[in-house]
Amino acid sequence: MIQFNEDIRSLSFAEIKEEIHKLSIVDLYRNDEHTKLINWLEEDKRKNVLSLKEKIEKDLESYLNEVKRVKTMYEFDKSFGSYRYIAGVDEVGRGPLAGPIVACSVILDLNVLEKDLILYINDSKKVKEHKREELSEIIKEKALSYQIAVSSNKEIDEKGIAFANNKVFLESCNSLSIKPDLVLSDGYLIKNIGIENKSVIKGDTKSASIAAASIVAKVYRDRLMKEYAKKYPHYDFENNVGYGTSKHIEGLKKYGKSDIHRNSFLTKLL
């Protein structure tokens, strides 16, 4: 544990680095100790120590910028009015050649303190896979309510992607354990919802609730497609999650379609 009253010059660089490695920028900031650490490092004029100080300052700046970005997303949701419960809903899987379309609805506590913001939420496609996995669990743990809905490839073929998209939006919202006063949907108004609904273009980059829904839906569907990859190994589902990559199309042409392919999406390929 670093003692800020200790003479830093009595420590080797390796000792300093080891101690700092144990620290969290987030905890330092929340405990108001980041300034103490930077001032302590500044007392040492060794170049490697000063470089370490600069790195910590950059990490702190990145963290504060992220807090600011996510605060703006929470404020965006609150800007619609004094609704008690706001749900964000998003889908994943409109475009793939195989597998279902999945939607998730999420109600967040939009009045949390800064320390309880869910940082790094964004359009799920902009978040790296390992981070999405981590965030999905955090969102499910912290959400006041969330619900996932699925429409199969067969239903997509029978009734069309627009019907399936609306169905999963509607089902995920109507199945929430808390009835929302407002639903923010990504890109589309939801037909027959019976709850006040506003669509937000590129909502997963603007709205905290929609971004959270985007991540949970993406992680759920990706896991599902990776399970399907074990049953249908010829299409590279573990990597393309059903989208029409060259390997996927190559598999289709060589082995034909599987039970989870969308026939209506394959008319120009087979």
Curated annotation (Swiss-Prot):
Required cofactor(s): Mn(2+); Mg(2+)
Subcellular location: Cytoplasm
Alphabetical list of InterPro entries matching this protein: RNase_HII, RNase_HII/HIII, RNase_HII/HIII_dom, RNaseH-like_sf, RNaseH_sf
A GO BP entry: mismatch repair
MF annotations from Gene Ontology: manganese ion binding; RNA binding; RNA-DNA hybrid ribonuclease activity
Ranges for domain RNase H type-2: 84-270
Superkingdom of the source species: Bacteria
UniProt keywords, alphabetically: Cytoplasm, Endonuclease, Hydrolase, Manganese, Metal-binding, Nuclease
Cofactor: record remark: Manganese or magnesium. Binds 1 divalent metal ion per monomer in the absence of substrate. May bind a second metal ion after substrate binding.
GO CC list: cytoplasm; ribonuclease H2 complex
Pfam families (UniProt xref): RNase_HII
Catalytic activity: Endonucleolytic cleavage to 5'-phosphomonoester
Chain's role: Endonuclease that specifically degrades the RNA of RNA-DNA hybrids.
Family to which this protein belongs: Belongs to the RNase HII family.
NCBIfam families registered for this protein in UniProt: PRK00015.1-1, PRK00015.1-3
Protein's name in the database: Ribonuclease HII
Lineage, opening ranks: Bacteria, Bacillati, Bacillota, Clostridia, Eubacteriales
